């Protein structure tokens, strides 16, 4: 790596440690020519993930959309912010562990519902009602019957 001070191409690593969020490695380097020290960061290159929406348009994956949907579904329910974050983490991990560069929004919705069902059934039904666009009370009842029968 080129020294930012003199441009020399060789250095030695003096110190190496993970950043606080564990998403990168911070390295202190020393130039072998001018002996000045500088910091570099090494991190995994993220390939942007595209979400294919119902209308077939594409947009970049946005974790905050998952969090916002979960927050609405869990409003006034005994679900902590930590649990909501864990669900978002779980969904994001499933997505990033796949080799896909595009994913359908419906697949993301199903992953969210699968995780939410384990945490709070009422929040699950709320999320499902918006996500699956329940049209009437019969659709609600059908979903609740499925939930009860799968216990």
Swiss-Prot record:
PROSITE patterns: ATP_CONE. Residues 49-139 form the ATP-cone domain. A zinc finger (unnamed) spans 3-34. Keywords: ATP-binding, DNA-binding, Metal-binding, Nucleotide-binding, Repressor, Transcription, Transcription regulation, Zinc, Zinc-finger. The keyword 4Fe-4S does not apply. GO terms for molecular function: ATP binding; DNA binding; zinc ion binding. Belongs to the NrdR family. This is Transcriptional repressor NrdR. The lineage of its organism: Bacteria, Bacillati, Bacillota, Clostridia, Eubacteriales. The gene is nrdR.
């Amino acid at each position: 790596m080129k020294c930012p001070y003199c441009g020399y191409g060789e250095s030695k690593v003096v110190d190496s440690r993970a950043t606080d969020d564990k998403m990168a490695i911070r390295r202190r380097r020393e130039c072998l020519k001018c002996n000045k020290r500088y910091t570099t960061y090494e991190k995994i290159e993220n390939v942007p993930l595209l979400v294919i929406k119902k209308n077939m348009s594409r947009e970049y994956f946005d974790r905050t959309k998952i969090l916002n949907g979960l927050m609405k579904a869990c409003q006034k329910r005994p679900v902590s912010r930590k649990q909501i974050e864990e669900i978002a983490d779980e969904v994001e991990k499933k997505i990033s562990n796949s080799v896909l560069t595009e994913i359908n929004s419906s697949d993301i919705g199903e992953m969210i519902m699968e995780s939410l069902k384990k945490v709070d059934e009422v929040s699950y039904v709320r999320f499902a009602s918006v996500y699956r666009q329940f049209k009437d009370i019969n659709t609600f009842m059908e979903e609740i019957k499925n939930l009860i029968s799968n216990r």
